[in-house]
Amino acid sequence: MKFFVVDDDPDSLALVTRLLTGAGHEVVVRGSSVEALRDIPDMRPDCVVTDVMMPVMDGFELTRELRRRPELAQMKIVVLSAKTYDFDRRRAKEMGADGYITKPINRDTFMQSIGELVTDRIAVTYWGVHGTLPVPGEAYNRYGGNTPCVSVEVGGEPLYVFDCGSGIKKLSDRVMRTPAERFSCRIFISHTHWDHINTVPFFAPLYLRGNQIEIFGPYQGDLTIERAISAQMESVYFPVTVREFGARLVFRDLREERLEFGPVRVDTMLLRHPGYCLGYKLSCRGRSVCYITDNELYLPTDARHDARYVERLADFVRGADVLITDTTYRDHEYPSKVDWGHSCVSQVADLAARAEVKRLHLFHHDPDQTDADIDLKLEETRKALAQLGSKVQCEAPAEGSALKL
């Protein structure tokens, strides 16, 4: 890649240049933002790395001026500054920066941070794929026995997390092992049944000052998502309350709506499940990830089958790069589980084929289903898709597996 580095500090300029060229990149440097604004349009770099506090024109002004030029719309801009305030981070985003890295420069993590910010990718990682309750034992080793948690990484954005089942403990461990000045994430709760919220207290980043965490979830009529989370942590149930979290924590109740966070858009849809349950569609730069759990798709022969709802759901997930969806039961298991709020293979395959998604990921497995059972369920789903003439790629992701889009 071709980088254009702007900084009036010669030591910082030299270090950034050394790190970037050492990784095989081409680097152009300027000690003045005025000179940079003059030269960048002609040089067309892939990425500009700019300091903030410079004379005549600061880094925010430079970012704003560059973003006003349509021919530079695809160019990445990363702000590199000793200012660690949240205000400045937000201001950089408002001006059009793709990311913000703080000084002093960490030689061990700088290139990783740059890579995450400038690489146009979305990474989906599975931390828990079972439903209802965690299941330990050898029979669950391949797919894992933790309950729902999926993370989505978007370069330059806070981490997006879907549900807080027991799998979030593994995500917590990963975050705590990664050196960072601060950690930010947005957590989206599908609904407040235990297997989707009861591991919130074990997400260690919540306890660290300087971290910023937002928790979104469906409004339950007279129960806010904040109250639902905090109630399970009252003293008779758990020894730590939400008041002891050190991170800056914000709760937000959701209905069917659209949320926009810079380049990321999150749409919501109410699902067929006891209580209020939301499905989510995360879209960014022409790609999308749909997280649809828990959800019951009744058989077409059942009087409760709602063709309008199925079509509406198909429209919601249409063309998704990956559909992560409740496939709790094999078809022969479903008749005794009707009205439990979960779906079976044939209806999930029909939804994926109807919506022409690119990938179907089976999720929220029944706790009684072992690795061998999930293998059979995957085989049945692939056969069902083939019978429908669908080219949808179908997988059953295991804990720790990741997909890059």
Model feature map: region roles:
Residues L13, P55-V56, A73, Y85, ...:
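The feature encodes the CheY-like receiver
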Residues A14-G22:
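Charged docking surfaces used in two-component/phosphorelay signaling
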Residues V29-C47:
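Acidic, metal-coordinating helix/loop segments flanking the phosphotransfer/catalytic sites
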Residues I105-I114:
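C-terminal output helix
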Residues D120-T293, Y298-A303, L313-A314, D371-L405:
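Binuclear metal-dependent hydrolase catalytic cores
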Residues Y298-V392:
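Cap/insert and terminal regions of metallo-dependent hydrolase folds
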